[in-house]
């Protein structure tokens, strides 16, 4: 597991987004300190009870949309800063990121796990290309993230 291995990881708090904090800018500032040293993880998942509490305060759709928009802004900011390898988890989040990145084409590449390949994408801020994988639902093994980046480095 990426986090258990001590890799750089940052949790996104939907309540801070709802309070008007520019969480995307904070995440990008944090990521800048790690870019070039290896993969980083920006995530928004939590224990089911915490998710229910947040959804109870904000509403399920609003909470989801805020997180998706924030992750999409972070993805775009990372690509603008030269990052050329992204893994996006979550179906709605994947769609938001593809849209925010302005991806116009994707070529299917090597399979990481059944149903989840690396893709080579064409996007305005990544004219030299972008390796991206869009992982939704329960696809992928428990070591998916580590395995995905190892595959690109092989």
Features from the language model and the residues they span:
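Active-site catalytic microenvironments in core metabolic enzymes, especially phosphate/sugar-handling
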Residues: 1-154
